Regions:
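Acidic/histidine-enriched alpha-helical segments
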Residues: 80, 123-142, 226-235
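M16 family metallopeptidases and their MPP-like homologs
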Residues: 30-32, 37-64, 74-121, 150-174, ...
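Scaffold signal of the M16-like zinc-metallopeptidase fold and its non-catalytic homologs
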Residues: 1, 144-194, 214-216
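Structured segments of extracytoplasmic/periplasmic soluble domains
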Residues: 64-69, 81, 85, 119-123, ...
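Short beta-strand/turn micro-motifs at beta-sheet edges
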Residues: 29-33, 87-91, 185-188, 242-246
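An aromatic/glycine/proline-enriched structural segment found at the starts
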Residues: 1-14, 19, 163, 167-170, ...
Length: 269
């Protein structure tokens, strides 16, 4: 029988405090220097997520298409340049934010950050790539609808947020197919503006890396005040209950539980 580890109180937890820096244009940047290996992660975070588009698929599709081409590089050139320099780029959309995460070797940092800046500031929204992404998203949705965990998550969101919130509306193949390049461009212009941006640099941070970030992102003109993502307040009144979704022939069951707590607009958030 496997010997279980001893239960004891946690001790010696070290929480690293980030250093704050302001880029030349006023963008806030946090840096956390930890680790011994010469690698780093650069996160570019924007206000605006699934709550803020016509439907929650808009922000997800925008995050996906950013890597598919800029006004100076196509998708293949972006992929080859990052791969050649040992870098990897992840793009993600959450309820209230979109995040681009660049993982890089420090020795190639100054070569790949300009590519990230080009992706952030100059996306081209190529029609063919958008069509491919929509097909992939629709196919992924069909597969997910066969999974009990996805159905539980979807039903919970509908019950908790209601149809008056983007987070409570189900994603459909029709809502995916209706997204256009012009809609993504408009969302990008509204939310992916410098005033809505924050930067986090972590890893074995070196002084010259801060200068590279400032050179690539600190020159972008900032106009207007930062925008606040839409509220995630449920559109229906909370009432404890149990919802059962029957899926014939399912080999597993999934349970999802939740309740309202503080919102982003609450003073205690």
């Amino acid at each position: 029988m496997m010997q279980r580890p001893e239960i004891k109180e946690l001790s010696n937890i070290q929480i690293f405090k980030p250093q704050s820096t302001t880029l030349d244009n006023g963008i806030d940047m946090k840096s956390i220097s930890i680790g011994d290996q010469p690698v780093s992660r650069l996160d570019i975070i924007f206000e605006g997520g699934r709550c803020d588009g016509r439907n929650q698929t808009v922000s997800e599709m925008l995050s996906a298409i950013l890597r598919e081409g800029t006004t100076s590089l196509n998708a293949q050139e972006i992929a080859e340049a990052l791969d050649y320099h040992g870098a990897w780029l992840g793009c993600d959309a959450s309820s209230h934010n979109a995040t681009l995460s660049l993982y890089s070797l420090n020795r190639n940092f100054e070569k790949v950050v300009p590519i990230l800046a080009d992706i952030v500031m100059n996306p081209s929204f190529p029609e063919q790539e958008l069509s491919n992404l929509k097909s992939l998203a629709a196919n992924r949705l069909r597969i997910n609808r066969q999974k009990v965990a996805f159905l539980a998550m979807e039903t919970f969101a509908q019950r908790h947020f209601g149809n008056g919130s983007n987070l409570g509306k189900s994603v459909t193949e029709e809502s995916i197919d209706s997204i256009t390049a012009s809609e993504l461009s408009k969302f990008h212009k509204q939310w992916f503006a410098p005033q809505n941006m924050s930067v986090i640099l972590s890893g074995k941070v070196e002084r010259q890396m801060l200068d590279v970030v400032n050179e690539c992102f600190g020159k972008a003109p900032v106009s207007g005040l930062p925008q606040q993502s839409a509220t995630d307040s449920p559109s229906i009144k909370f009432k404890p209950d149990t919802v059962v979704v029957d899926k014939p022939d399912a080999l597993q069951s999934a349970v999802r539980m939740g309740m309202p707590t503080v919102l982003r607009t609450d003073a205690d958030y």
